[in-house]
């Protein structure tokens, strides 16, 4: 969609799906075949607002039911830290994390929530879920 707004950001984040990030490592799930949920929270997430260049602060929540592999947390921490200086919209970050985790561990179920601090009086919460077909 074309707009007459010179401040538009259409097309400026097209590279996000292919953005190079550290590998999310994994380990064998020795309880494969059992459905259990793993939840973790990144309470001090930061990235950069692509419009203002100012930092965005928020909480990232990840919840998944593993299949054959589980996320190795140190590598996930390094993966998350790689966004610290990246200009990325909230919506795209949640989608990118979800797709990268799917590539890494092929979970049975995955939910990623980006719960961002209010900016300009607006609080943003972005959620995406995946269920293995």
UniProtKB/Swiss-Prot annotation:
Family annotation (Pfam families): QueF
Pathway: tRNA modification; tRNA-queuosine biosynthesis
Record's catalysed reaction(s): 7-aminomethyl-7-carbaguanine + 2 NADP(+) = 7-cyano-7-deazaguanine + 2 NADPH + 3 H(+)
Catalytic residues as annotated in Swiss-Prot or TrEMBL: 49, 56
NCBIfam families for the chain: QueF-II
Family in the record: Belongs to the GTP cyclohydrolase I family. QueF type 1 subfamily.
Protein name: NADPH-dependent 7-cyano-7-deazaguanine reductase
Source organism of this protein record: Leptospira interrogans serogroup Icterohaemorrhagiae serovar Lai (strain 56601)
Name of encoding gene: queF
């Amino acid at each position: 969609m074309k707009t007459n707004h010179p401040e538009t950001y259409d097309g400026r984040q097209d590279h996000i799906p292919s953005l190079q990030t550290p590998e999310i490592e994994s380990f064998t799930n020795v309880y494969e075949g059992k459905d259990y949920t793993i939840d973790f929270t990144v309470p001090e997430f930061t990235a950069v607002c692509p419009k203002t260049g100012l930092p965005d602060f928020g909480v990232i929540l990840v919840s998944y039911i593993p299949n054959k592999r589980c996320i190795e947390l140190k590598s996930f921490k390094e993966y998350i830290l790689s966004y610290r200086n990246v200009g990325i919209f909230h919506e795209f970050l949640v989608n990118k994390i979800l797709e990268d985790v799917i590539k890494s561990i092929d979970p049975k179920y995955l939910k990623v929530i980006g719960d961002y601090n209010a900016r300009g009086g607006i609080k943003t919460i972005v959620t995406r879920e995946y269920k293995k077909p």
